[in-house]
Amino acid sequence: MGTFKIRCKVENIVDREKSAIIPQMLVDTGSEYTWVSEHVLTKLNVSREKKDVSFVMANGQIVTRHIGFALLRYDKYFTVDEVVFAEKGDLLLLGARTLEGLSLMVDPRKKKLVASGPIPAA
C-alpha cells in the first residue's frame, strides 16, 4: 500500500483552547491506536487514564505506554479517541480506531484519506 503522512490537530477534550498541530503523522492502519508525543499531550494537559499498557511494536519488541483521551481533527472531520503517550523514538501514528471514528479510510492509490461513506447502524 505504501505510506503517507497527514497534518492532524490534537485538542484537550475539556479545554479545546489547548491544542497542537502535528504536521507529520504517519497513517498506519496496522496500529490500533493513535500515538502522539507525550510532550505534546502533557502540554495539552491530557490525563494519563490507563497506565503501563503493553504494546507489541512492529519489530516484535514489547513496550508499555500510558493512554489518555483527546479530540483529533483532520480536515473537516473530528473524533474523540484514546491516544498513546508516545516516547522519544516512537513513531507518531494515526491508527485504525481513529480512522474509523473519523469515518475515513485510506485510498491506497492516491495515498490519501477519503470519506468511508455512511455509517452502518445495525
How should these model regions be labeled?
Residues M1-A122:
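Pepsin/retropepsin-fold aspartyl endopeptidases
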